[in-house]
Amino acid sequence: MATSELSCEVSEENCERREAFWAEWKDLTLSTRPEEGCSLHEEDTQRHETYHQQGQCQVLVQRSPWLMMRMGILGRGLQEYQLPYQRVLPLPIFTPAKMGATKEEREDTPIQLQELLALETALGGQCVDRQEVAEITKQLPPVVPVSKPGALRRSLSRSMSQEAQRG
């Protein structure tokens, strides 16, 4: 299967406003594929000969940065499709104004980003106020075995009481 591709690149720069735009995309793809339902196969068992021929077609796919896609077979017209819009990032890109600034000079983190970071911390199993188990058990009262009121204490050991039951 042979394939040819054509890429496009657009760039523009506005020095007055200090803006620049650059885009590159794969615009046109032309590929040769076997054509469905267009094949010929012959066999001659007496002469031990076979003949096989497969029809081919050229498929054209054209993409654009405006989310339009045209595709079809070359010479038969193209079908146009509108692709769905998809945001690439869930949040706007945030960069501090001064990268080398101290913590006091920096701008506050946006609220959306703070909430996202807090959620990631919670889902990651990290706890900000984490304490060691030994510190927690120091704060607890000592463990005392519970006895029922009115219950008699054993006077004999277990083995002695078993012998007494046997008689």
Curated annotation (Swiss-Prot):
User: Which domain of life does the UniProt lineage start with?
Assistant: Eukaryota
- UniProt keywords, alphabetically: Cardiomyopathy, Cytoplasm, Disease variant, Limb-girdle muscular dystrophy, Phosphoprotein
Localization per record: Cytoplasm, Myofibril, Sarcomere
Offer one Pfam family short name for this entry. Answer: Telethonin
Q: Which illness does the annotation name?
A: Cardiomyopathy, familial hypertrophic, 25: A hereditary heart disorder characterized by ventricular hypertrophy, which is usually asymmetric and often involves the interventricular septum. The symptoms include dyspnea, syncope, collapse, palpitations, and chest pain. They can be readily provoked by exercise. The disorder has inter- and intrafamilial variability ranging from benign to malignant forms with high risk of cardiac failure and sudden cardiac death. Muscular dystrophy, limb-girdle, autosomal recessive 7: An autosomal recessive degenerative myopathy characterized by proximal and distal muscle weakness and atrophy in the limbs, dystrophic changes on muscle biopsy, and absence of telethonin. Cardiac muscle is involved in a subset of patients.
Task: Map out region (Disordered) in residue numbers.
Answer: 144-167
The name under which this protein is listed is Telethonin
Which InterPro entries is this protein grouped with? Telethonin, Titin-like_dom_sf
Q: Give the principal location in a single coarse category.
A: cytoplasm
What does it do?
A: Muscle assembly regulating factor. Mediates the antiparallel assembly of titin (TTN) molecules at the sarcomeric Z-disk.
Q: Name one GO molecular function term.
A: molecular adaptor activity
The reply to whether Nucleotide-binding figures as a keyword in the UniProt entry is no
| Positions bearing Phosphoserine | S39
